């Protein structure tokens, strides 16, 4: 990754990373869940949709078998390439819609955002070698199909080792107060995805809850079971969100 500078070596106005790097220290841990669709480069349709709309969702998520999964060899090649580069991908899985996939990318500090950007680049490059496209739009297919998000798990030192129910709930309340500002930075066309359906909260509303996949912020069972030491999951960011902007916002908005 490189930063953009002007001819006089000052930070270019488009360089959001410089400001983020000053506040997003290694105390902050991020786990990005990057969702996307593999696509036919000629038609733009998701892989597996060549003969029309496939059967409804239900058997594709973490599925096995040629009738349930397409693109696994590409996902596996991407995983191996990222690991060789030192990018910590912690897992992959077929997602809810046919042709939709996810990988999880973990990192500390601003490197988390850098690694997600590089992993996206590698995803497009490796898919190209297979003659396949990639779509990270948050709602490539309308109708009764899940969109694609960038659910983000995050924590700082206090959350991991000095947590309490009061701390986590106060963080959620604070995030609720700046919900509109956050949404503006969570990717384009996110209103098509955050409808209140398909495991989302409405874009105009904010909520949080324990193990609630329909909430804006999910408090994981892991956190509760570890005496309120752990992390939060922000389910609002779209699959095309900028991880640099996200980490910068999080370091500002979540602090007491």
Roles of regions detected by a PLM:
Residues 236, 241-242:
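Long, repeat-rich segments with strong aromatic
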Residues 102-113, 128-235:
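Loop-rich catalytic cores of soluble enzymes, especially ATP-dependent carboxylate-amine ligases
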Residues 10-12, 114, 160-164, 242-243:
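Short, conserved charged micro-motifs
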């Amino acid at each position: 990754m490189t930063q953009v500078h002007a001819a006089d070596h000052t930070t270019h106005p488009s360089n959001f990373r410089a400001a983020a790097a000053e506040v997003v220290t290694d105390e902050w841990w991020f786990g990005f869940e990057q969702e996307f669709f593999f696509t036919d480069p000629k038609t733009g349709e998701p892989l597996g949709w060549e003969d029309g709309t496939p059967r409804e969702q239900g058997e594709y998520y973490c599925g096995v078998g040629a009738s349930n999964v397409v693109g696994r060899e590409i996902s596996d090649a991407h995983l191996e390439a990222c690991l060789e580069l030192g990018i910590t991908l912690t897992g992959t899985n077929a997602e809810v819609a046919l042709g939709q996939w996810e990988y999880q990318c973990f990192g500390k500090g601003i490197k988390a955002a850098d690694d997600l950007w590089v992993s996206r680049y590698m995803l497009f490059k490796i898919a190209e070698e297979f003659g396949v496209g990639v779509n990270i739009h948050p709602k490539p297919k309308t109708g009764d199909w899940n969109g694609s998000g960038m659910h983000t798990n995050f924590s700082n030192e206090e959350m991991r080792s000095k947590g309490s129910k009061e701390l986590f709930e106060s963080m959620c309340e604070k995030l609720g107060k700046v919900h509109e500002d956050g949404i503006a930075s969570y990717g384009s066309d996110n209103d098509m995805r955050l409808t209140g359906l398909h495991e989302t909260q409405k874009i105009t509303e904010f909520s949080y809850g324990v193990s609630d996949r329909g909430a804006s912020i999910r408090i994981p069972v892991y956190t509760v079971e570890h005496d309120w030491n752990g992390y939060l999951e922000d389910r609002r960011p779209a699959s095309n969100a900028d991880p640099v902007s996200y980490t910068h916002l999080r370091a500002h908005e979540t602090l007491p």
